[in-house]
């Protein structure tokens, strides 16, 4: 539920995304998108397993899907495939929301030679003041969070687009004043 929840918000607020384990569906989605995509395991955390795929690497997609989806015991895993948001290489913003209202934010910047901005993946943290666009995003999603009983969450935002809602373990409390 954690990583799937953000799909409940309108597409205007988030990048185009699919959650699937069907190779054909994933290939079609990948072909229909721009030049870059983000692939992440549905059950991952802390940036583990999150990779940036460029369209020119399409010939390697079968190998990636074998690794991410197919288990040796014959079972399969779901993956999230998300349209790349320009500017993601500059990091993301983690916003903590309590009772539908933002209580603080931090900018997470990727480490050297990495696209992931998670602190556990080598990213660093900077102070951040919410932009007008980020405040508006919080205003739009806050009521639904409360309605769904999600009183304390961390959302990840890139260029005003919602990329993830962390409902189980919204890290970042210690970094926010």
Regions found by a protein language model. Name each.
Residues 1, 108-111, 158-162:
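Short glycine-enriched loops at secondary-structure junctions
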Residues 1-20, 24-28:
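Conserved N-proximal alpha/beta basic substrate-recognition cap immediately N-terminal to
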Residues 7, 52-54, 168:
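Short, glycine/charged-enriched secondary-structure capping and boundary segments
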Residues 18-19, 84, 155:
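Glycine- and other small-residue-rich loops at beta-strand/loop junctions that grip anionic moieties
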Residues 23-24, 31-38, 42-137, 141:
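Phosphate-binding site of ATP-dependent enzymes
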Residues 28, 106, 173-176:
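Generic domain-boundary/flexible-linker signal
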Residues 129-177:
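ATP-dependent carboxylate activation and anion-phosphoryl transfer catalytic cores
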């Amino acid at each position: 539920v954690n990583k799937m929840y953000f799909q409940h918000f309108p597409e205007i607020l988030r990048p185009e995304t699919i959650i699937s384990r069907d190779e054909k569906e994933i290939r079609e989605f990948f072909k229909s998108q721009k030049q870059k995509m983000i692939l992440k395991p549905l059950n991952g955390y802390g940036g583990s397993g999150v990779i940036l795929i460029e369209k020119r690497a399409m010939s390697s997609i079968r190998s990636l899907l074998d690794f991410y989806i197919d288990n040796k015991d014959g079972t399969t895993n779901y993956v999230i495939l998300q349209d790349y948001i320009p500017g993601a290489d500059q990091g993301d913003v983690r916003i903590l929301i309590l009772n539908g209202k933002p209580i603080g934010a931090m900018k997470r910047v990727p480490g050297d030679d990495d696209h992931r901005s998670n602190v556990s993946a080598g990213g660093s943290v900077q102070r951040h003041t919410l932009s007008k666009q980020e405040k508006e995003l919080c205003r739009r999603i806050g009521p639904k969070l409360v309605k769904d009983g999600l009183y304390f969450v961390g959302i990840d935002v890139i260029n005003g687009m919602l990329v993830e809602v962390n409902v189980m373990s919204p890290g970042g409390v210690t970094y926010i004043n």
